[in-house]
Curated annotation (Swiss-Prot):
One of its GO terms (cellular component) is urease complex. The gene is ureB. The keyword Lipid biosynthesis does not apply. NCBIfam families: PRK13203.1, urease_beta. This is Urease subunit beta. Its main location: cytoplasm. Heterotrimer of UreA (gamma), UreB (beta) and UreC (alpha) subunits. Three heterotrimers associate to form the active enzyme. Gene3D superfamilies: Urease, beta subunit. It is an enzyme of class 3 (hydrolase). One of its GO terms (molecular function) is urease activity. PANTHER family: UREASE.
Length: 164
């Protein structure tokens, strides 16, 4: 019985020492030494993202009868056909919002959204298969065949609404 008590006491002392020997709080909050397990250490200044990318603003109207949600990394040009906006201006762009988030468009609502160009190789596949290739601007990389006009034609042919 005393062994069990000693073992429990030793464990308790170990836990207490972990709690008390973690350092002191800095003026900004917790330091790495005293942050509770699972806690976060935040920077003194806000984290910014996409600050060096050109922003294109487009007005979007949901002409459908149901809410439509578009995620942060969806090729906005290929978004739901009931959304009416300047699709040509949205070619090769995504929403300028945090990763893993989305914007919801209620039926009949009209709102302006910020778009930024995709990063990396700017080659997009899937979505609604309107593009399936390079969407960048400027010098065309080897083996890429940009065809923005063809993608715009396909979108109109398949009933994707556009304001222009």
């Amino acid at each position: 019985m005393s062994t069990k008590t000693n073992s429990t006491k030793a464990t308790s002392e170990k836990t207490d020492s972990l709690k008390t020997n973690r350092g002191t709080k800095s003026s900004a909050g917790y330091s790495e030494q005293n942050t509770p397990l699972g806690g976060c250490i935040l920077a003194d200044t806000p984290i910014t993202f996409n600050e060096n990318k050109p922003v294109t603003k487009v007005k979007v109207r949901n002409t459908g009868d149901r809410p439509i949600q578009v995620g942060s990394h969806f090729h906005f040009f290929e978004a739901n056909r009931a959304l009416e906006f300047d699709r040509a201006a949205a070619y090769g762009k995504r929403l300028n919002i945090s990763s893993t988030t989305a914007i919801r468009f209620e039926p009949g609502d009209e709102t302006e959204v910020p778009l930024i160009p995709f990063g990396g190789k700017q080659t997009l596949y899937g979505f609604n298969n309107l593009v399936d290739g390079w969407t960048g601007e400027g010098v065309v990389p080897n083996s890429e065949r940009p065809d923005k006009l063809e993608a715009i034609r396909r979108a109109a042919e398949r009933g994707f609404k556009s304001s222009k």
